[in-house]
Amino acid sequence: MFVDKVKVYVKGGDGGNGMVAFRREKYVPDGGPAGGDGGKGGSVIFKVDEGLRTLMDFRYQRHFKADRGEHGRPKNQHGKNAEDKIVRVPPGTTVIDEQTGQVLADLTHHGQEAIIAKGGRGGRGNTRFATPANPAPELSENGEPGVERDVILELKVLADAGLVGFPSVGKSTLLSVVSSAKPKIAEYHFTTITPNLGVVRVDDGRSFVLADLPGLIEGAHEGIGLGHQFLRHIERTRVIVHVIDMSALEGRDPYDDYVSINEELKAYNLRLMERPQLIVANKMDMPNAAENLERFKEKLTDDHPIFPISALTRDGLQPLLRAIMDTIETTPEFPIYEETETESRVLYKHDKEQDPFVISRADDGAYVLSGAEIEKLFKMTDFSRDESVRRFSRQLRHMGVDEALRQRGAKDGDLVRLLEFEFEFIE
């Protein structure tokens, strides 16, 4: 089964907790703090594997969670960093954040990697908090939570050239005679419902990858017919091979077919019209095909080259294949997404800055604190130790939480809630 769009959940591993410990050794009277830092949580990394062709595996496994880092140890021993979780995807996979719609990565070549969910850093042990004023702190941090998100994976097949046209114009037949591909061929519309790829070898020894894409009908850019399922795959092709049925046996005018298909391509993505397009006049072995081709040429205002062929009798194929190959070699790749990052190994985009906290009122009158930054501080605080609680209180005051609560009307003794933690507001 060909699967080209799935939704998955990914979560980076949490960092390991820092440790509170002290040196207690003979002949070391002033041992001092000796709690180690926690290890870094593993990241979820998507990596391109050229041996994969579909997203089929993701139909059965939709959750990917990296391991958390080890906790810090006594004697200032750092906890072990967790291994990254590598998730293999086929070339041509685009990763999109479901909530924001942001493209996180566009993975096209073998071995390319992108960090999709970054692991949290390890919490600091009490050694890191020692100061001249407090040389023996009973204070440490919990590990930072790893990033978690739902992402949409879209597969857009990687092909040098793509066959487009109305259903039943002979695209699958053409692919089957110029390559070893065996697409399903029948005399009804939408026989092809998934892309088929074939390697085409030209008579001079050169070769290219040709994609037979599902037939297109009017309104496809709005999702009619196979809609976006088809149009998505043509975005990566360098050359568009437009197949037209010159026999007109189905009652459609060949020129009207040509105009309709190009209107759909233009409506879906204007950049598709930048690609070179070759017109294939197919079924020239049928009656009236030659007359229809002459009328087509009279109406055609574009300068796209026309290649009369018969996929069934194989007439005219080699000139067409050589022209496709020549066009591919002189046409650069068209980037789908503009990337500003230059790092070749990984791609990780930081989220836009958000307010550190938001204050709202619950039905019971409590003031509710929320926000990514304040919730991260909460999760990294060890509330089993008084010194950690006092530090958390100072952090809230430094962020301006106390003053913001006063401006919202909070009074002495009012209830304030942050995640599962509740405390009283004190002036």
UniProtKB/Swiss-Prot annotation:
Its main location: cytoplasm. Residues 118-144 are annotated as: Disordered. Its cofactor is Mg(2+). Residues 349-427 form the OCT domain. GO terms for cellular component: cytoplasm. SUPFAM superfamilies: Obg GTP-binding protein C-terminal domain, Obg GTP-binding protein N-terminal domain, P-loop containing nucleoside triphosphate hydrolases. One of its GO terms (biological process) is ribosome biogenesis. Residues 1-158 form the Obg domain. Belongs to the TRAFAC class OBG-HflX-like GTPase superfamily. OBG GTPase family. An essential GTPase which binds GTP, GDP and possibly (p)ppGpp with moderate affinity, with high nucleotide exchange rates and a fairly low GTP hydrolysis rate. Plays a role in control of the cell cycle, stress response, ribosome biogenesis and in those bacteria that undergo differentiation, in morphogenesis control. This is GTPase Obg. It comes from Halalkalibacterium halodurans (strain ATCC BAA-125 / DSM 18197 / FERM 7344 / JCM 9153 / C-125) (Bacillus halodurans). The lineage of its organism: Bacteria, Bacillati, Bacillota, Bacilli, Bacillales. The gene is obg.
